[in-house]
Amino acid sequence: MVPFVRMLALAAALLAAPALGFAADATTVSPKGQKLAQELDSMGVESKWIAGAHIDWETGLPDGRPERMPGRHTHCSAFVAAFAKKLGIYVLRPPEHGQVLLANAQNEWLAGDGAAAGWRPVASALEAQTLANSGVLVLASYHNHRDDKPGHIAIVRPAATTPEAIAAVGPMVIQAGSVNSASIPAKDGFAGHVHAWRDNEIDYYAHEIAGE
């Protein structure tokens, strides 16, 4: 989504969204946040959803089919969709949309139809980390300026940090990508997209986890 249109859509969604409850700050991880972190780590993202492999989107394991996409096709959006499904939460995924350019499509879906599925925009990186620390599922999403080029999406992982660190390098995320990581600052995780961190074009969306 182009930056100006993206800002208008986010502002409208923020005005319409009900408030999410969260802990006081981003410096501590609540018991619910600790549970969320354990569930994220159980996905084994650093050994699954590997770039360049043709995978089953839900398991992250190679499906035996040759990868025909040019370059090293990455699976950030498949990992996010798989984890959300594990929690019983819907985010745009196959078969409603194929894996190719899914991150861009998820960004558009979150800003539009995602509200009806329980997703709410988050105003800042600091709030995104705070929500994750309280046990809320939070996504960090970037739409490429070109519709025919991939965007990126990651999950904000619970982590004890500081407002100063978040301002400098962003919230901590877990992601599949060119390099998969269970814990990496958003600034580094989105480094392959020059506009994402530099131009403040990462969108954050939150969804309460049932039973939490």
Task: Give the ranges of each region predicted by the language model.
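Bacterial N-terminal signal peptides that target proteins for export
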Residues: M1-A9
